[in-house]
């Protein structure tokens, strides 16, 4: 459903008080100046039609608004990434909300929302690039209950039905705020690996059931109480250039808890850093399991201690 991926549908969610940050539509530099005046700073300027946290700019001062807007136009050109071709030159400016980031995975069938679980995420301070995700969430039940309650309100306000959804939001001092919803399953190995390997139940199977009209209400598994914590972690480059290799990559698979290593670059591939490109800096993805988030973080620290991304 394009209804949910179109960020303007937040207007529907805005009818539920406190559910999402204030925002304004931006099509020109003047629109941006007006939005900054109305909403204030800091704020987030981003394209309407994108995925994977692409094209996100944090606005903290009025001094470089024109430069930032021109950079946004250039870096979100459909020539750079076809994801921008669906809603070309359509942007929103929204209030920046401080807090930890989460996503919620589930399906909606016959207007009833079924939640598979909550994913704890981390993003880079600049450009909000997602580089790590843990499933299921470590948060206390009270927090998870609030996130789920607001997720259901958001989904129902959009009136989407008979599809999977992937909702993103942040936990602020004044509660959970919804940032965006896509009427599709999550990427980043969440749907394909993390949920299944953590819980022992296939989430994809239920997504297919919804798509073909099989009722999921009586057979909805418990995805959140498996005996393992799962994680995907992205190794990133920190400079532009030509990719040479990841020194130490061969040893990663020998570490207990590492399930898979997926290289994303071959020798000689160009690496372009944000904001010129938002996904080129990702060099490899690692899927890990452990007894806890802390357990997996220790494994990641071990990996980071001996690998080196070599860029020429």
Question: Which residues fall in each region the model found?
Answer:
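Peripheral (often C-terminal) accessory segments that flank ATP-dependent C-N-forming ligase machineries
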Residues: 208-312
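Active-site "cap" helix and flanking loop/linker of ATP-utilizing ligase/carboxylase catalytic domains
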Residues: 146-167, 182-244
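Short, well-ordered beta-strand elements within core beta-sheets of diverse protein domains
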Residues: 57, 95, 196, 282-290
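Beta-strand scaffold of nucleotide-dependent catalytic cores
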Residues: 57, 67-70, 92-95, 101-122, ...
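Conserved ATP-binding module of the ATP-grasp superfamily
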Residues: 20, 62-98, 127-133, 152-157
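ATP-grasp fold ATP-binding core
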Residues: 13, 39-59, 78-99, 104, ...
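Short beta-strand-to-turn element immediately C-terminal to the catalytic PLP-Schiff-base lysine
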Residues: 26, 56-61, 107-109, 172
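Short, small-residue-biased leader/transition segments that mark boundaries at the very start
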Residues: 1-8
């Amino acid at each position: 459903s394009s209804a949910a991926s179109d960020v303007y549908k937040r207007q529907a969610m805005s009818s539920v008080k406190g559910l999402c940050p204030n925002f304004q539509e931006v099509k020109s530099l003047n629109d941006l100046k007006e939005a900054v005046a109305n909403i204030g700073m800091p704020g987030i300027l981003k394209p309407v039609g994108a995925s994977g946290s692409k094209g996100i700019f944090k606005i903290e001062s009025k001094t470089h608004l024109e430069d930032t807007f021109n950079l946004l136009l250039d870096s979100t050109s459909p020539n750079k990434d076809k994801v921008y071709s669906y809603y070309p030159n359509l942007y929103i400016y929204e209030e920046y909300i401080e807090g930890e980031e989460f996503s919620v995975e589930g399906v909606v069938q016959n207007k009833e929302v079924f939640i598979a679980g909550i994913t704890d995420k981390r993003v880079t301070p600049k450009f909000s690039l997602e580089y790590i995700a843990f499933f299921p969430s470590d948060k206390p039940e009270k927090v998870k209950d609030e996130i789920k309650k607001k997720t259901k309100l958001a989904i129902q306000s959009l009136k989407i039905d008979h599809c999977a959804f992937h909702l993103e939001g942040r936990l602020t001092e004044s509660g959970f705020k919804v940032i965006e919803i896509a009427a599709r399953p999550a990427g980043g190995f969440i749907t394909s690996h993390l949920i299944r390997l953590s819980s022992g139940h296939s989430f994809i199977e239920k997504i297919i059931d919804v798509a073909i009209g099989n009722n999921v209400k009586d057979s909805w598994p418990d995805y959140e109480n498996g005996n393992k914590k799962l994680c995907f972690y992205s190794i990133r480059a920190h400079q532009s250039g030509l990719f040479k290799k990841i020194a130490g990559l061969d040893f990663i698979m020998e570490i207990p808890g590492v399930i898979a290593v997926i290289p994303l670059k071959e020798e000689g591939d160009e690496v372009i850093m944000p904001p010129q490109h938002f996904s080129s800096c990702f060099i490899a993805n690692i899927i890990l399991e452990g007894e806890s988030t802390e357990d997996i973080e220790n494994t990641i620290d071990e990996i980071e201690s001996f690998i080196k991304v070599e860029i020429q």
